[in-house]
Regions:
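Nucleotidyltransferase catalytic core that binds NTPs
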Residues: 1-170
Length: 170
């Protein structure tokens, strides 16, 4: 018989803050746009669970992605649903704050013990939340998951070029 998969609950930042006092254990937070999600994202999320008891994944909102790379490929609701199905994820926080390209407000509100980053995010120059983590006493762990071999932007560019060739043959 196959094992039943329980999806992690998806909630707003305020909903998580409301239940935070009842959560016991060493809390780890990781974040990303996950648009589209790829094996590097999954490796970072799964590996993040090794740094604590409770894993919260903050999914950056559509404004963040629009500001970073244009129109999102997948909307926030869809990206949260996919992340909630990944093994080891305990909570998914849909995080949408316009005019902010960081998750500093989420870190301040959630107060995890650890903040993990994967890929090429390695120091204060590449992690805008670094100083806030130091201020709040949150340990930053870098290099989580696989090295930077996947890129959402590259995946989308390849997809676009294939579609272009399909409709506009040479």
């Amino acid at each position: 018989m196959s094992e039943r998969i329980n999806f992690a609950p998806i909630m707003s930042l305020q909903e998580f803050v409301d239940i935070r006092p009842s959560i016991e254990g060493y809390l780890v937070l990781t974040s990303g746009g996950y648009d589209p999600i790829h094996p590097g994202h999954i490796a970072c999320i799964v590996d993040s669970k090794n740094y604590g008891d409770v894993l919260v994944v903050v999914v950056n909102g559509d404004w963040f992605l629009s500001n970073k790379k244009g129109v999102p490929f997948m909307n926030l609701e869809t990206r949260c649903a996919v992340v909630s199905a990944i093994r080891g994820v305990d909570y998914v926080v849909a995080f949408e704050i316009e005019n902010d390209t960081t998750v500093i407000q989420a870190l301040e509100a959630i107060q995890p013990e650890v903040f993990t980053k994967g890929g090429d995010r390695v120091d204060a120059d590449t992690i805008p939340e670094w100083a806030a983590c130091q201020e709040y006493g949150i340990e930053v762990v870098t290099g989580v998951g696989d090295s930077k071999v996947h890129s959402s932007s590259n995946i989308l560019e390849d997809w676009y070029n294939r579609r272009l060739r399909m409709f506009m043959p040479e």
